[in-house]
Amino acid sequence: MEKVDTTSALQPLIKELLVQNKMGIHARPAAMIVRITNRYKCDVFVEKEEEQVNGKSIMGLMMLAAGKDSKVKFIATGDDAAPMLGELETLFARKFDEA
């Protein structure tokens, strides 16, 4: 798996988010996340425990097996990282529009 380049001139922004919806990050929430991340040019990776995946990959996100009450960390590098992380924070707070 690809790791975050820590030698970049831009410092990564990191946001840890709590998965609050009942079913966790399954196909639909993963697609919602990717819909947001793909609108931005920044690089984004998602970590759960020791595993890191590309935040622009539905399959990668599903492989994290992030269930309810899991914490996932978004690591974004680029000029538009902050607004993207803000959108993701809102999406997680809305519980992916699920009950």
Positions of PLM-derived features:
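Intrinsic-disorder/low-complexity, polar/charged segments enriched in Ser/Thr/Lys/Arg/Asp/Glu/Gln
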Residues: 10-16, 71-73
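Short, intrinsically disordered low-complexity segments
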Residues: 14, 27, 93-94
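A general secondary-structure boundary signal
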Residues: 14-18, 45, 85, 89
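Intrinsic-disorder/low-complexity peptide segments enriched for small residues
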Residues: 8, 60-62, 83, 89
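Compact, glycine-rich, soluble single-domain proteins
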Residues: 18-59, 63-67, 76
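SAM-dependent methyltransferases
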Residues: 1-13
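C-terminal structural segments of small proteins and small subunits
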Residues: 67-99
